[in-house]
Structure formats: C-alpha cells, structure tokens
Amino acid sequence: MRLFAWVMCCLLLCGQAVQAQVRSYDQMIAAGELKVAVYKDFAPYSFEDHGQPRGVDVELAQALAKAMGVRLKLMWAPPGEKLDDDLRDYIWRSSPLHERQLADLMMRVPYDHDYAQRRNDIGELANAQVVMFGPYQQECWQVAYDRRRLDSVGSVAVFQQHPIGVEVDSVPSFYLTSVFNGMLSAKTHHYPGVSQAFKAMQAGEVDAVMAMRGEVDWQVHEAADPQLALAENAYPNMGKQRWEIGMAVHESNRQLAYAVEEALEGLIRDGSLKAVYARYGLRYEVPEMYQ
C-alpha cells in the first residue's frame, strides 16, 4: 500500500513538472508581454520575410498587444494534423516540441458554434479547456484563373476540360475529385501547397487554382499579372462554403478574451484591420458580429 501511494505521488509530481502553467490576465499584464501563437509559414497570415515577421495575423497581434499596453512575443506554430492538436499544444497542455511553453492567445481558430460544441467519444466537449471567440475575418473558397487560357468560370463544370490546381488533401481537392460523380477528377492536379499550385498556373500546367480566398488574393496580388482573374462561380453540393475566423484562449482566461475583444472591436470599427488586409492585397469582410 505504501509502495502504491509512493508511486502515485511520483506520478502526480511528474505530471506537475511537465504540465505548463496557464498565465492569468493579471500575470500577463505584470509580465508586460502577450504570447501569441501564429501558424508558421502560412502566408499571407503569418510568415517570415528576410527574418522579419509579417502577415495579417502578425500585424493584428501587434495591434492587440499595443492596445493592451504590452509587448508582443510570437510563438511560431507548425500546424498539427488536426486543430485539436494545435489547441492542446499551444493553449492548454503544451508540448515538448516548443519547451512546453503555452501561448496566452492563439490566432486563426474557427469561430463556429458547432465546432466549439463538438463532443468526444465519451460525450465530453472535445475542447472543453478552450474558449473560441473574437471573429475577425470572414473566409470562403475562391477560384483564380488565367484569362489567356480560360475565358471565364461560369461553373466548376469547365474543369472537365480545363486543368485546375489544388493543395493536396485539402477541401478543394476532395470536392473537385468527387463532385459530379468524379467527372472533374481527371483534370484536378495536386500540389504541396497553394503557392506551388499558382506557380504551376503561371507555368501553364493548369488553367486555374482553387483555395481559400485569402490565400488566392495574396497569390494574385504577389503575381501582379493582369491576366489572372477571380471567378464568381458557385460550388454546388459543397456544403459549408463560408465561415468566420477568430481566436482562442484557455477557458480559465476569459478576462484576457474580454480585453482582446474590446481591442479588436476598435480595430474593426475604425478601419485599421481592413487596412492591414489591404496591405497584403486581401479583400476584407466585417464579421457578422460587428455589422
């Protein structure tokens, strides 16, 4: 019995040793530093350019920290296999891959009631330790095409004849290879990322690219090619085609969420956030909460 108690004590102590501490709002203010997790190498939202952090999410995080009177510390987050993994590693449990440091705030998290209320196999909330809040962007799917090889995109049916590029294992990939009983699959070309798909379009390998609107806007902006156009087609049988992007904090840190929401609303209403998006060539739609 004593041996069992000793083993349990050791296990508990070990668990405490590796469990990262969630900072309260007061501790964050006292430290004078807001730690924000942003996705690594995810242009135009968060990336490094000649060693300098850039991107919409980076500039928004900088503005939020400034509004709260603290400095910003970025935590570059390589995306996991699932968003649940990222929330676990950066918001509530931590990971040895980044020295078990937790972020105070994580950017680019879906602001979606159904996702937030998902249950696991035993009926518990899948992300009970996380509060998802603060929608700051509306996102949707977008097709860009080269007018030198494609006159217009009235319907995705044109991709029975014209090749289109998508990121491998993405929603556009699954959609284009399955819609219309797979009639578009032969002309759907897969690439490691959206930037590679755009390079393929510029090289003439494909006539169009489908991805998230923000990524497409950025690629078109960077290409500065007047022959690249944005389609206005619909996506039949696709399901959810528009969604909002927000942020996340630990469920015990709602005070920080309230402070961030207050700062965010000011940036949206005075046009500052729209100006950030414009600097990267992105269209900006105000989230429904602020309309």
Where are these regions (language model features)?
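Periplasmic-binding protein-like
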Residues: K40, Q137-Q142, R213, H221-E261, ...
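Hydrophobic residues within well-ordered alpha-helices
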Residues: L64, I91, F159, A200-Q202, ...
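Acidic, polar ligand-binding/catalytic clefts
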Residues: L74-V156
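A ligand-binding cleft/hinge motif common to bilobed small-molecule-binding domains
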Residues: M107-E124, Y175-V179, Q202-A203, D207-Q241
